[in-house]
Amino acid sequence: MSKRTYEVVANLGRRVPSPSAAGGGTPALPNCRGFANTSCFPVRKGAFSFLLACAILPVVAEVPFCALRFGYRFTQPDKWPEMRAALEKNRPAFDEVWFSTGVSFPSLAWHEEHARQCAKAADDLRKMGIVPSIEIQTIIGHTDGIIGAGDCSGQDWGTMVSADGLPAKHLSCPRDPKLIAYFVRVAEMHAAWKPGSVWVDDDLSYRNRAPVLKPGNRLAGCFCDACIAGFSRAEGKTWERAALAQAIRSDAAMRTRWDDYSCGVMGELTRAIAAAVHRVSPETVMGYQYGGPLYAAIPRGLYDGSGHPVRLRPGGGSYWDTDPNDQLNKAYYLQNLLDGFRGEKWIGACCPEIETCPRTFACRTAQGLILEAFENLALGMDFLSMFAADARTDETTDFYADDLFPRLATAHAFLQGYHAANDGTRPCGFSVTNERPAKLVACRGVPIVGATRRSLGALPDIASIGVRMAGSGEVDVHSPLYQTRVMQIASSTGLTNFYARCDRAAGGKMPVVFESAVRAFAMPRVRADWTLATVAIVNASIDRQEPVTVRLRGVPAEAKTAVWHQPEAEDVVIALVREGANVRVRLPRIGAWACGYLSFR
């Protein structure tokens, strides 16, 4: 990499911090230049504060609304007829399908045959009106173990090396010319069948590349001789591995330069892949799947190579239905991963990672997928992607054809209708200071917003509920987890009083106020003039939510009635009771872990 390229990349290396230890996940990398560390949210210079209202983001209509991701086996001759039949049988479920190149490094001859199989499957999808796309599921590699379980006969390039000199067996050095040439050729092969989009997966990241990042090491980046030599040229100083590692650990400025250099190397790799796709299929859009911090150089390389705004799919965790609250928590986290990048000319539509692991019936249900999709749309995502099928297990295709896909097909119109009703709107609620808001706060009827929002200000101190434990005095509200503890044991009276406190803090403009305590996620969406467009509700409990009265603000003056929409039920018309600026609505009974939304007409 030239000194000039390094300097350019240095301006692209900003990233969103990972969750804190309290919120779960890997601690944030330091030196997040250009960020407002008080809240772990990035704020661009010259931009409005994240607590201020900003321009309305339109729904991106040209993007297929719901994509299905699946493993490479489903496009092979013995599996594709079954999957094609399942998709035909449940045509409304999906608008796009992402094929896969697999998770190892087979020969280019294998990829050539696989591209031919994908081309045939793509023709079948187009006849159904489904957009065919593909993800390059492995470039650097997820882990040595995952890569090594497959065919690695095509790997003839160097591997990553840790800061203490430990070489990986399969994890790839991102600057190796042979690696770049291999994936440029793979990209060209698949671009020949004109995919709607080509995605690079979250293995192409700057963290969690085991065993390079091992306990006691934890320095990201490749410390092979070639990468150290490239950094030395950029620095104008010769570095040895041990001295460089020590300098990175002890010098924050050095750490920043190393981060920027390493991310820039990956950006050059993505630029080469995107340019290869663009040469063969100029209309194909590039996408980037990632978990944790977003290093701008990587998707920026996709933009520079293709000329198209890059679609983003942040992700990370909650792959089971064992704790639906965590899926809501994840939805907030994903929004925060996008904060600071929305509105950039090189960023296009964004979707959430909705994923099951290992894609069988014991992990996720159709209802769980629908709820997670609904929550992410409520918080501001543009479209949906679901990794919901895999042929690596012994799961038979009839499970998808007869169980999972039919429910998703039924819910598609509900989800798309909700998305359309939110065109030109933003979520509206309170801002919080921690990156992942306590899930029980959002699930007690208090609207909390993530990145793309209209803020009512800071969330009032939950300790004001004043909870006491029977026989043990007051709750320790100074604990790092006090929000969860207090909200978990709050009485109905204490919670109802907290609603009133929140409304006072918002100057009496809180768009949705429950008249009595609920266990529910509520997310109002408002237009530029603060009029109310929709109110999303999820019953966040294992029991039904009995009918409850909701006080609304900002209901359009011309609205005569409200309509209650649910995924698998008829719409219900509800009377509006106007009392000055307030409008009262009586919500019907909501089933356990069920969702719906109000619109107005």
Regions found by a protein language model. Give the residues of each.
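Aromatic-lined carbohydrate-recognition surfaces of secreted/lumenal glycan-active proteins
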Residues: V63-T75, S133-I139, W199-D203, T256-P299, ...
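Substrate-binding cleft/loops of secretory-pathway carbohydrate-active enzymes
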Residues: N208, R257, Y261-Y333, T360-L377
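Aromatic-lined substrate-binding rim segments of carbohydrate-active enzymes
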Residues: R84-L87, T101-S153
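Active-site-adjacent "subsite" loops/lids of carbohydrate-active enzymes
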Residues: I134-W193, Y206, G236-D259, C263
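The substrate-binding groove and active-site-proximal loops of carbohydrate-active enzymes
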Residues: C66-P77, S100-H114, G165-Y182, S250-E268, ...
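Active-site neighborhood of glycoside hydrolase catalytic domains
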Residues: Y182, A192-S197, D201, Y206-R207, ...
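Catalytic domains of carbohydrate-active enzymes, especially glycoside hydrolases
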Residues: T75-F105, A192-S197, E372-F383, V446
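Carbohydrate-binding surfaces of carbohydrate-active enzymes
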Residues: R279, E283, G292, P324-R601
